[in-house]
């Protein structure tokens, strides 16, 4: 392994999160048709969160919007024409999943979709922004903003956040 860890399996913590080898941080994502893993040395990267989501089907759109979009995100979707609605909703959902995977190992607490707001205005350049609406820890307070990456490919949306030292 290029990260300096011996060959090993990824364990599962009591909270069902991955237990990475010592000195390694990472994130896992999967759908019915793909699996992806991002790994880094803990000495260089604090946390990583990645997500891959199939584009939300029209039949599921309203339920996903209700579950994961903030009122401001819904309003923004009404005003924007950058992406078809189902693709924008998928991107927001995916970004919140990636954000959770990135921050959970650092804050060690559950937080839901309403704890962050996603700004998609930079999507054309592959950039997304997440702003916390609630304080998760002394370091990650309401108003904290993190920049991530977005890629839309055929039938999937890919998002990622990475915190370096």
In which residue ranges do the predicted regions lie?
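Core catalytic alpha/beta fold that binds nucleotide/phospho-ligands
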Residues: 1-165
